[in-house]
Amino acid sequence: MRGLLQDIPVRGQKRVLLAAPRGYCAGVDRAVIAVEKALERYGAPVYVRKQIVHNIHVVSELERQGAIFVDEVDEVPEGAHIVFSAHGVSPAVVAAAADRGLRAIDATCPLVTKVHREAVRFARDDFEILLIGHEGHEEVEGTAGHAPERVTLVNSPDEADTIEVKDPDRVVWLSQTTLSVDETMETVRRLRERFPNLQNPPSDDICYATQNRQVAIKKVAQSADLVIVVGSANSSNSVRLVEVALEYGAKAAYRVDYASEIRQEWLDGVATVGVTSGASVPEVLVQEVLADLAGAGYADVQEVKTAEEDLMFSLPKELRKDIAGKRDERALGGRRS
């Protein structure tokens, strides 16, 4: 794989422009490892509320290892271990798990937890919260659940034109972490036209990984005839990457879960293929796409890097405590009298 310089070469013979950063973000990596470590520490089954991350390959691999995915905590046997997904949960879900005596491991992404804390603080300070996000998404449900009497959901820029608030001087916007940056800023612009005193969150709610992947695919799309985004249909950030690619110059863009879904007709007359992946996609799936494209004559892979990522999150505290306790038990057991 050749590294790409500042300027992408002009279209020519068959090649792949591989976006970087791509794939797993720190929050997804932490959540997946949390389930794997829980299975290792407690043994199967370990229950997970909702999909741990929005990727069918990851979910099926964890199921193979002994994870059981459920929609709600009342499906979990009393006293069992349950992992809350990276998208976060409401206080009501936490309480329901406690009522069943479940041993909960909270794998909520710390960047989502940050939004939860913002919602609690602004609600406490008597602000109305305009939450920009997609109705029905687990992350939105979790955030809204932290301030249910104060949150109004804004699904799109058009909805910003019709939202009503009680006090336009005490209103703040927050957002789902996986949205299109451009669309979110357009929504905020239109909200501020109606509510000039609209407050911003203390820091960006859209996560670094979502932003970085969108910036990279914008660069790639400018020179691509076709863009392939690896990611699942229910992955908000993967779907947004397809939209961004089309907005920034790609002649066509498609989302696939696996390389086997790439259609030959997509490649007809195509010289440059852009490739990226959503934040919940393991790199092995991208490599399978590259291998498939190489077989079709696209063996020249040029990486388009727009940012470096080195953020890492520690495991959930509940898991760290149990793992540390197990080490202490082993240490004590190994001492000679």
From Swiss-Prot:
EC main group? oxidoreductase
Among its keywords, does the record have Iron?
Answer: yes
EC numbers on record: 1.17.7.4
Task: Name its pathway.
Answer: Isoprenoid biosynthesis; dimethylallyl diphosphate biosynthesis; dimethylallyl diphosphate from (2E)-4-hydroxy-3-methylbutenyl diphosphate: step 1/1; Isoprenoid biosynthesis; isopentenyl diphosphate biosynthesis via DXP pathway; isopentenyl diphosphate from 1-deoxy-D-xylulose 5-phosphate: step 6/6
Catalytic site positions: 139
User: Reaction catalysed by this chain?
Assistant: isopentenyl diphosphate + 2 oxidized [2Fe-2S]-[ferredoxin] + H2O = (2E)-4-hydroxy-3-methylbut-2-enyl diphosphate + 2 reduced [2Fe-2S]-[ferredoxin] + 2 H(+); dimethylallyl diphosphate + 2 oxidized [2Fe-2S]-[ferredoxin] + H2O = (2E)-4-hydroxy-3-methylbut-2-enyl diphosphate + 2 reduced [2Fe-2S]-[ferredoxin] + 2 H(+)
Q: Which residues are recorded as binding [4Fe-4S] cluster?
A: 25, 109, 207
Q: What does this protein do?
A: Catalyzes the conversion of 1-hydroxy-2-methyl-2-(E)-butenyl 4-diphosphate (HMBPP) into a mixture of isopentenyl diphosphate (IPP) and dimethylallyl diphosphate (DMAPP). Acts in the terminal step of the DOXP/MEP pathway for isoprenoid precursor biosynthesis.
Q: Which HAMAP family match?
A: IspH
Q: Which PANTHER family match?
A: 4-HYDROXY-3-METHYLBUT-2-ENYL DIPHOSPHATE REDUCTASE
Q: What is this protein called?
A: 4-hydroxy-3-methylbut-2-enyl diphosphate reductase
The scientific name of the source species is Leifsonia xyli subsp. xyli (strain CTCB07)
